[in-house]
Structure formats: C-alpha cells, structure tokens
C-alpha cells in the first residue's frame, strides 16, 4: 500500500512539472555568487527527448568569446554515469570556477577562469543521462537509462537543439567529454554520422571528438591498474611478479578457484588503499575538510541546491530534489561493452579524434589507453615526442594516420581539472589544426 502511495505522489509531482514546462531556453546575465554581469553569453534550458519527449535534458550553452559565428560547436558530456556537466563547466574547461573557501552558509563565490575552452569554441554542457544534474523525466516509471539509450538521446538532443539554433548548423561540430562518457562518445559520433548519411537534413557539420582518460572496455582498463601501480613504485617488484605469475595479467575478472591470485589482489588492494586514484599525487582525505582537494566539489552542491540559484538558472520548480555533482543512483545499463568498434568505424569515415590521458591517473591508466589504441593497428604518422609549453615538457604525443592523436598530460589526473591550463593549450592547438 505504501509503495502505491509513493508512486502516486511521484506521478502527481510529474503532472505538476508537466503543466509548468515545455521545451524552453533562457539567456542568463547574472548568477548568484558571481559579482556583476557575466562576461560571456550563457543560455540554459531543456530539450525533450525520447518517447513523447518525456526525458527533459538540461543544458548550459556558452558562446565562444572569440568568433561564435564560425568557431567550433562542442557538446560536453561528463562521465559517471550520473555526473553533471556543470562539473565540467566549473572544474575542468569552463569560464567559471568556485573560489575554494570554507562554506559559511551563503552562496559560494564564483570567479572567472583563464583557461576556458570557450575562448575558442561554443560549448553545450549537457546533463545526461536523464536524472543527472537538473535533467529529469516526466515519467516516474521510465526505464533505467542505458548506454545505447544515451547515444540515441544525445543525438536527438543535438538535432533538436540545432533546429532551435539554426545559426550553428554550419559550425564544425565535435562531441567531447571524459571518463565514462569516453566509452559512449564514439558511439554518439557514429549515430550522428549515420543520421547525416541516412535521414536528417540539414546535416550536422560533424568533424570529430575529444575524449579525456576515457573508459574503453572496463575489464581491459582495470587490468592496467596493477602494472601502473608497479611502474610508479606503489607496489613491490616481488608482489608484481607474483601477481603476473598467478593471475596471468588478468586482474579484473579472476577465476574464483584461483585463490592464490585472489589473495595477491587483496595484498595489492592493501598497498594502494591510501592512494587517491584519480590523481595519485593528491592526498586521499575526507572531502568535508576544507583542506582536502575534493572539498571544492561540495561547493557546487551547496550552490546548485540554493533556491536563488535555481531561479536564476530557470530550473523547473519541483523537477529536482537534492542536486548532486555525481549522482551514482542514476543507474545505467552499461550495454556498450567496448568503444573500439566505434573508433574503427569513425576513423574509416574520416573523423578527427583527440585522446587525452593524464599520466598520474590510476582509475583509467595511460597504459591501458595506449594498449587499446595500439590494438586499432593504425599506422603512425608522427612518432612519440614531447609537447611543450614555454620550453617545458607538458606531456607526450603521438599521431596516427587515421586522424587520431594521443596526448598525455604530465602530472595530469583522471579529469582536466588537475591541469586546466595545460589541457586548454592542448585543446586550442588541436582544434585549430596546429601541431601540439
């Protein structure tokens, strides 16, 4: 009985939201926490996708500060699944960031950045899959999101967004993102490309994609954590050699009868339990402490949960409870097991791709990224070399015949935020066709 009452209440809430809202967009000139008018053009809104447009995907669109009529148009997808694109906007490559200071109960302070990709590109920061950030579903009984469902919905979103903003149809278009979205993005590129070939006019001026520390195939990616840990002196030679001998190089899917391998993996887990895997150089600490690096993530949650902020962003009232930067309750059917077939298809069609890898990320180690790129068997057009900023090594790069570029970021982590200036230089060079 109680469960039916709960479902009825959910249904009533959705009816109220439905009454309030259809596809909408608003120009935002001021944001709580930022002093004065915004120094860039921001639009927020919803686009309905899926059956009867039940899924309302929320976005932040920021015009290029250079030449928006001609500069590339990007859609940015944060990983998770379940992490809001607002995380990319304020922590990775957007024109705003939070001033890191102890929360005092007021609206957290926003400041301008120097490294935003919007210096040279128009960017749509998209909250997806549904349930992420401020996106929501009108149907409380909707199916659990899936990788393949996300592919179709992002494609639908992009086409509908461009129909409402036809002045951007001719701009070079790229799909961008990091972490888990790196597994889905190549499939989205293929879906958009298929639409261009098969059905949809006007065509999207699709040029390629950018993925940072991307998931390619989870079991494959995880298998490289132990070799990475050994390479950076987190585990001993003896433990590493024993793991190789007992587990045969497969550490993520282990035969339950192989007790020796399982015991050695337990020993490995103990060795690295105090390591912050997203950037092994950072301290692993309690995120509620202002001295902890991840404390800054709380500021976005305090900010987005403020009612004044929601009104400023034109968030539909009643559509979202507590906002979370990464809501891992947004379950997803991970039905794309590997991105590799999509990379192959996209390269055959001539799309450019940039794969960025922070070299101190143990979540998706650069060793695994290099391995799956090697498996594509692309010929090399430019051998491994350092790329530089002001005569200093910022990372290493290699270019392939099929328009794929791999670039590591020295001292970088799982996302762009750990080296935002270096990642900005890297992106600006690549997107303009300059050598890295």
Curated annotation (Swiss-Prot):
Glycans are attached at residues 104, 306, 345, 377. It is found in: Secreted. Expressed in seedlings and roots. Keywords: Carboxypeptidase, Disulfide bond, Glycoprotein, Hydrolase, Protease, Secreted, Signal. Residues 1-24 form the signal peptide. Probable carboxypeptidase. This is Serine carboxypeptidase-like 15. It comes from Arabidopsis thaliana. The lineage of its organism: Eukaryota, Viridiplantae, Streptophyta, Embryophyta, Tracheophyta.
